From Swiss-Prot:
It comes from Autographa californica nuclear polyhedrosis virus (AcMNPV). This is Chitinase. A motif (Prevents secretion from ER) lies at residues 548-551. Glycans are attached at residues 173, 444. Plays a role in host liquefaction to facilitate horizontal transmission of the virus by hydrolyzing beta-chitin and by regulating the cysteine protease VCATH. Localized in the host reticulum endoplasmic via its KDEL motif, interacts with and thus prevents VCATH secretion before host cell lysis occurs. One of its GO terms (cellular component) is host cell endoplasmic reticulum lumen. InterPro entries: Chitinase_II/V-like_cat, Chitinase_insertion_sf, ChitinaseA_N, Glyco_hydro18_cat, Glyco_hydro_18_chit_AS, Glycoside_hydrolase_SF, Glycosyl_Hydrlase_18, Ig-like_fold.
Length: 551
């Protein structure tokens, strides 16, 4: 009798048993919506975008009932439901993130749940990454003026000799970061200006192999997405390099807008061919594709140097034709970005870096161009340099110097030219030079006006002759006599023993630019280039040296 009772109780217990605990099988659960080929040198082979990833999961039940219905949970949210007997599932994932995945098995008596396993789905919005926080370095101080644009250029090649990766950029103090530079594919006759830099033309041809001319690409895939850097150094990290760090840094700085700058001094040649609508269409479509692939970007900056010519390639330039092409190009880019906004729900900016030379401003109808542009980055620097040993002057200045009141290459003259064309002052962003330009062997000057003399060539530079980083100027300041021209709002240093003369932006001159921007209700300031600063100049842009109400 007792035996029969125990047998009945055992049958009841079995019939009322919830499923056994599922154990998820081991597997590599790192996925990417944009796959990177780490062996590739050509952009066409570098990336493989996907609309979704298929996350495969299988499980076993080592003891007990296998259940009737199985569920797969991501962070406790159901993402799949099916027959428990299959012991496997495929989940289609369309977004990035790190998810705790569990399997839940159920029957009429209840459910059991597995231990979690981590699923990592990477995408170029960086949703799979931990935020890359900035550690305050050198003289940088926290504090950003939120009422003005505060932007800076970061260069792709800065990770090499300059040893200045993204994690060294004081991003909390910037509203915009401009990534220099994104190239446009094309070989002989299309990118000839690039041949002036040893190896750079050849590097672009490797990256553009198999890619149609006039499509954008990445110039240096190793620096951009393959080089291990802080926060993106794991062997299985899908996006390393500058791009990977920018994705992570943006998570820590959600206010930040990052724009790829297309063109630049030696990469502007292809723009001169875009009077051809077919070439222009190829370019615009490729920019759209680029933004769809690299989701951390917030728009595009066009740095055509320069419509009308007088750029790195003296054989290119047609003032009337380029002026029309520039307007058309901006209109078509803006229309493309509008379509992309409608598709994604995001906001995409279109900006342009332009020369501050009055003669180059006169080529373009900026009143018309501004209809497509959110901001105009006025490159108010490189006015003078060691390309001339007889025409010495301020390489960056707000006003004309007292010793040359007829000087037209000034920030004020450029701003005034744009305002007279009808450009919205709030769209004008004034440039700060985080470097100096200079001469050596300066002689034959009069009345201690060193700029009235003649030079004997470019002075010793930080990375190239005649160009000195602000950081180095500040470090070597005791070797010079420093002068601030308060009338022009410009700075320079001079070493009489060597005749070394450097014109540069100092804290004094940058504060002068800040006042000028505020007084004229301009949109803000930007800098070329952030790796050359020790923090002094960016602090000055953000008005750290004086309260805002004293400006």
């Amino acid at each position: 009798m007792l035996y029969k009772l125990l047998n009945v109780l055992w049958l009841v217990a079995v019939s009322n048993a919830i499923p056994g605990t599922p154990v998820i099988d081991w597997a590599d659960r790192n996925y990417a919506l944009v796959e990177i080929n780490y062996e590739a040198t050509a952009y066409e082979n570098l990336i493989k975008p996907k609309e979704q990833v298929d996350v495969q999961v299988s499980w076993n039940v080592w003891n007990g009932d296998i259940g009737d219905i199985a569920y797969v949970l991501f962070d406790e949210q159901q993402v799949w439901k099916g027959d428990a007997e299959s012991k496997r599932a495929t989940i289609k994932v369309l977004v990035s993130g790190q998810f705790n995945m569990r399997v839940k098995l159920c029957n009429e008596d209840g459910c059991s749940v597995s231990d979690p396993v981590l699923v990592k789905v990477a995408d170029t919005d960086g949703g799979h990454l931990a935020p890359l926080e900035y550690t305050w370095l050198e003289n940088n101080k926290p504090g950003r003026r939120e009422d003005k644009i505060v932007a800076a250029y970061f260069v792709e090649w800065g990770v090499y000799g300059r040893n200045f990766p993204v994690d060294k950029v004081p991003l909390p103090n910037l509203s915009h970061l401009l990534y220099g530079f994104i190239p446009i594919c094309g070989g002989d006759g299309i990118n000839d200006a690039l041949k002036t830099i040893p190896g750079s033309f050849e590097s672009l041809q490797r990256s553009c192999k198999g890619r149609e001319d006039f499509k954008v690409a990445i110039h240096d895939p190793w620096a951009a997405v393959q080089k291990p850097q802080k926060g993106v150094s794991a062997w299985n990290e899908p996006y390393k390099g500058n791009f990977g760090q920018l994705m992570a840094a943006k998570l820590a700085n959600p206010h930040l807008k990052i724009l790829p700058s297309i063109g630049g001094w030696t990469l502007s040649d292809p723009f001169y061919f875009m009077h051809d609508v077919e070439k222009r269409n190829v370019f615009v479509d490729s920019v759209k594709e680029f933004l769809q692939v690299w989701k951390f970007f917030d728009g595009v900056d066009i740095d055509w140097e320069f419509p009308g010519g007088k750029g790195a390639n003296p054989s290119l330039g047609d003032a009337d034709g380029d002026a029309k092409t520039y307007i058309l190009l901006l209109e078509e880019l803006r229309a493309m970005l509008d379509d992309l906004e409608a598709q994604t729900g995001r906001v995409y900016e279109l900006t342009s870096a332009i020369s501050a030379g009055y003669d180059k401003i006169a080529v373009v109808n900026y009143a018309e161009a501004q209809k497509s542009l959110g901001k105009i980055f006025l490159m108010s620097y490189d006015f003078k340099g060691a390309w001339s040993n007889t025409d010495l002057g301020y390489q960056t200045t707000v006003y004309a110097p007292s010793w040359n009141s007829e000087e037209l290459y000034t920030t004020h003259y450029a701003v005034d030219a744009l305002l007279k064309q009808g450009v919205d002052p709030n769209k004008i962003i004034v440039g700060v030079a985080m470097y100096g330009r200079g001469w050596t062997g300066v002689t034959n000057y009069t009345n201690d006006n060193y700029f009235s003399g003649t030079g004997n060539g470019p002075g010793s530079g930080t990375w190239e002759d005649g160009v000195v980083d602000y950081r180095q100027i500040q470090k070597d300041l005791n070797n010079y006599v420093y002068t601030f021209d308060s009338a022009a709002q410009a700075s320079y240093v001079f070493d009489k023993s060597k005749g070394d003369l450097i014109s540069f932006d100092s804290v004094d001159s940058v504060l002068g630019k800040v006042k000028y921007v505020d007084r004229n209700k301009l949109g803000g300031l930007f800098a070329w280039e952030i790796d050359a600063d020790n923090g002094d100049l960016l602090n000055a842009i953000n008005a750290q040296f004086k309260p805002k109400d004293e400006l």
